[in-house]
Swiss-Prot record:
Pfam families, A to Z: Flu_M1 (PF00598), Flu_M1_C (PF08289)
InterPro entries: Flu_matrix_M1, Flu_matrix_M1_C, Flu_matrix_M1_N, Flu_matrix_M1_N_sub1, Flu_matrix_M1_N_sub2, INFV_M1
Lineage summary: Viruses, Riboviria, Orthornavirae, Negarnaviricota, Polyploviricotina
Other information: Most abundant protein in virion. When expressed alone can form virus-like particles in transfected cells.
GO MF annotation list: RNA binding; structural constituent of virion
Location within or outside the cell: Virion membrane; Host nucleus
Role played: Plays critical roles in virus replication, from virus entry and uncoating to assembly and budding of the virus particle. M1 binding to ribonucleocapsids (RNPs) in nucleus seems to inhibit viral transcription. Interaction of viral NEP with M1-RNP is thought to promote nuclear export of the complex, which is targeted to the virion assembly site at the apical plasma membrane in polarized epithelial cells. Interactions with NA and HA may bring M1, a non-raft-associated protein, into lipid rafts. Forms a continuous shell on the inner side of the lipid bilayer in virion, where it binds the RNP.
Annotated region (RNP-binding), positions in chain: 165-252
Keywords: Host nucleus, Membrane, RNA-binding, Viral matrix protein, Virion
Originating organism: Influenza A virus (strain A/Swine/Iowa/15/1930 H1N1)
Protein name: Matrix protein 1
C-alpha cells in the first residue's frame, strides 16, 4: 500500500459516512495527485464543511498543509491551530513535547506510527499542533505516521463506544441512544440538503424525524416501544438513503 493510500485510509476512517465523506475522499485524492494546489481554497472549503468535528478538520488541515507543494510558508489557520491544541490540557502538551523528541529520531512512516500509538489522541493532536505551528520539524513520512496513529486512536475509541452502546443490556440506554442517533441524523440531513436536488424531500424527512423524537420525549414512550421508532423512521431514512447515498446501517 502506498503512503498516500495509507494516509487516506486512516483519515477517512474518522469521517462520518455520507456524501461529505466522498467529498473529503476526492479532496484527499486530488491533493495527493498534485491536482489541488491552492491551499487557501482547500482550507476555506474544509472550514465550512458541516458535520466534521473540529479535530477531524484540524487533522485534514494538517494533511493538506503538509502535502500541497510550496505552501508551507502561508499563514497558519486559526481553526486548525485550535483543533490541534490538545483541548488546552497542559498534560497533553507535556506529552506532545516528549513525543516530538522521539519522532525527531525516527525517519520512517511505520517507525513514527509505532512510537506515536503509545500516546493518547490528545497528546498526538498537540504534537501535530507543534509541527503545524512551526515549533518543530519532522520529515513528511514521520508526520504522516503521526497522523495515522492519531486517526487509529480516534477510530478505536469510536468503535469501542459504539460496541458498548450496541451491547448494553439496559433498555433505557438503548432506547435513548436510538432516539439520539435518529435526531443526529436528521440534523445531518438538514445540513446537507442545501445544495441537493432532493433538498425539499430531505428537509421534510428530517422534520418528520425531529417531530417524532420530540413527541416521544415529551409524552414518555416505554423502551419496549422502541421497535416502532425504528420501523417508522427507518422507512423514511432509507428512502432518503437510496437517493443520497447516506449510510444508515447503524440503525438496524
Amino acid at each position: 500500500m502506498s503512503l498516500p493510500t495509507e494516509v487516506e485510509t486512516y483519515v477517512l476512517s474518522i469521517v462520518p459516512s455520507g456524501p461529505l465523506k466522498d467529498e473529503v475522499a476526492q479532496g484527499l485524492e486530488g491533493v495527493f495527485a498534485g491536482k489541488n494546489t491552492d491551499l487557501e481554497v482547500l482550507l476555506e472549503w474544509l472550514k465550512t464543511r458541516p458535520i466534521l468535528s473540529p479535530l477531524t478538520k484540524g487533522i485534514l488541515g494538517f494533511v493538506f498543509t503538509l502535502t500541497v507543494p510550496g505552501e508551507r510558508g502561508l499563514q497558519r489557520r486559526r481553526f486548525v491551530q485550535n483543533a490541534l491544541n490538545g483541548n488546552g490540557d497542559p498534560n497533553n502538551m507535556d506529552k506532545a513535547v516528549k513525543l516530538y523528541g522521539k519522532l525527531k529520531r525516527e525517519i520512517t512512516f511505520h517507525g513514527a506510527k509505532e512510537v506515536a500509538l503509545s500516546y493518547s489522541a490528545g497528546a498526538l493532536a498537540s504534537c501535530m499542533g507543534l509541527i503545524y505551528n512551526r515549533m518543530g520539524t519532522v520529515t513528511t513520512e514521520v508526520a504522516f505516521g503521526l497522523v495515522c496513529a492519531t486517526c487509529e486512536q480516534i477510530a478505536d475509541s469510536q468503535h469501542r463506544s459504539h460496541r458498548q452502546m450496541v451491547t448494553t443490556t439496559n433498555p433505557l440506554i438503548r432506547h435513548e441512544n436510538r432516539m439520539v442517533l435518529v435526531s443526529t441524523t436528521a440534523k445531518a440531513m438538514e445540513q446537507m440538503a442545501g445544495s441537493s436536488e432532493q433538498a425539499a424531500e430531505a428537509m421534510e424527512v428530517a422534520s418528520q424525524a425531529r417531530q417524532m423524537i420530540q413527541a416521544m420525549r415529551t409524552i414518555g414512550i416505554h423502551p419496549s416501544c422502541g421497535a416502532g421508532l425504528k420501523d417508522d423512521l427507518l422507512e423514511n431514512l432509507q428512502a432518503y438513503q437510496k437517493r443520497m447515498g447516506v449510510q444508515m446501517q447503524r440503525f438496524k
